[in-house]
């Protein structure tokens, strides 16, 4: 990165950031290879091509020239996999260059992110990228709010608009032309972003490149929206420029162009709200407010018009669902989140008179959707649709310890992810299903009964299904099981989780 930064500093005096020449630098492809996306295709294919230098600029020049040949862009349905270049599939060379191009177009954003961290005391930024970091924020804010809008970010976007949105970041024309070529090529291959319900599915090839495009598109969608939220709030929030979110782009904007003030004064008057909060996750976003239903509907129709006018997307109002937190639950990252009243009675004594005061406090609840989770376990053949554990087919050469480790790891992962649940009963039931399914699998393998295996293994099988924290506490308090129950009755948000659990992703 220091070498790239030094290269770009030369052109900063001319107020230009030329990225296209970097495409012919060999270390770019080394960086692309080190990032772990399609690791073997670049080196192995170059060896097959017969070149000593794995990523020479001569090879890249030839590949780019070959890509721009008009007759090669014609894709026939009957001959889609037969076009070869030096004995390889037609998409190999564009695949190779696209890997390097994905690294190059990220450079302006990476440099801006590095400069934003200067002078800020952050030791390990990856600790701030946990999915669970969202929940403490919601726990502190949602209990004071009334309404929430569950928003599905519209897709797909027109390819040319993606190029236009990157012009303010990538300023040299050759890079933009090459980007336009890649987008239209993948558009013909039907390998671009495709919707599957509410989740964006990216092409398995060049996932890094498409994730970059999607993040830049969402960044563009949020730029004006975040500005409006800041200007419409009486309590100005501090920009979280140093906090990394897994699904967010590199850094939230510190300040937007001052020109926006004059253009949106009327809009700001319509959306004046002291408490407005915004969270994005998995192609969705949440807009929560303490306002009235009228205000939430204003935001709803403003967002629909904003998407249609700025991105030429026909977005229906059904993509935005307004819910009252006191009456509806929010399906959020594998949890059912809601705000409920927690009643309490306080007795007050004043001299000879006593008073009983009834009070209610809003409490943020996170519950594991047990029905959906059992459905996921049933789909994975751990139980039937009713939640009754069944034996899972395994390979004949699998050892007992491997089977137990596999079941135990799944159980620990689920317990770790859903540790923030308000009620642990659902987790206990999931542990029971996995433990008994493991016992039935072992009994089926050895043609024995479940009772015999449980009697023979006993506590050893139980220990495999304990989390690391439970195991440590059981060693410290071997005779105080009630302490364990008390400690694990509350919510625990582990901040080392960077992606949603596969079984928790019911959508």
UniProtKB/Swiss-Prot annotation:
Subcellular location(s) of the protein: Plastid, Chloroplast
InterPro entries: Domain_X, Maturase_MatK, Maturase_MatK_N
Keywords from the UniProt entry: Chloroplast, mRNA processing, Plastid, RNA-binding, tRNA processing
Source superkingdom: Eukaryota
GO CC annotations, alphabetized: chloroplast
GO biological process, one term: tRNA processing
Record-level Gene Ontology MF annotations: RNA binding
Protein function: Usually encoded in the trnK tRNA gene intron. Probably assists in splicing its own and other chloroplast group II introns.
Record family assignment: Belongs to the intron maturase 2 family. MatK subfamily.
PANTHER family referenced in this protein's UniProt entry, alphabetically: MATURASE K
Name of the molecule in the record: Maturase K
Higher taxonomy: Eukaryota, Viridiplantae, Streptophyta, Embryophyta, Tracheophyta
Gene name per UniProt: matK
